Amino acid sequence: VTETLRALAARYDRRSALTLALLLVTYALVAVMWRRYIDLSQRDVLLVGIWIFMTALMCWDIRPQRDLIRAVVGLGGGLVIEAWGTVTEIWWYFTAERPPIWILPAWPVASIAIDRLARAVDLVLPQGDHRALWWLMLPPFTIGMTWWVWPSVNHPMTMAAVVAMGVVLVWPGATREDVRLMLAGSGLGIFLEYWGTSRHCWTYYTLETPPIAAVFAHGFAAVAFQRVAALCDKAVTAWRSALPQRN
């Protein structure tokens, strides 16, 4: 346990301090831009805890190229997911926007945070590819999520979402990586979804706080984002290799 904690702590460095400063500036800008939605008279311990934890993750083991790619993929994927969910009314926000612009910055932050958390999970996860866990988590989720969104299956965006989940399953990926992303994303999803639904920031059509499908969807989305990010990683590496070498 001590060695694991030391390994985790060793991945904080000078870049962590710079990242923390940039994050604090970003948080301040977001708070100013959407201050009409902020009520400082209420103390939300859970929200503060979530943001402290995610900020700690954002400052850990910084890899600029990897992080930038996952931020862009997370933003794009988040926009598609939010548009799908709000247009089909699988969920809706208290502002009735479809989707609200203010929720979008949370997606790249969550994408990087889950990637960090998954790498931390890798330090404590037993050796092996955990293929059995993969089969116990990803295919059942796909079936369960399809059943959960079935009331809106006639909508083209829901049809596309179901097809996309199938593509993620058959798209070759590292089994161990999928498992740790699913664990990390779903673990963080528990707190994010409970906060959002219990505070009525967003509401699902089932009125659950929160629906189990929504919790595990964070993990599956992380796996899907990684599929796309891995392609981007390869493209950037190939592009750099093709550049003229400096003497």
PLM-predicted stretches and their roles:
Residues 1-247:
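Aromatic-rich, lipid-facing transmembrane alpha helices and their immediate juxtamembrane interface loops
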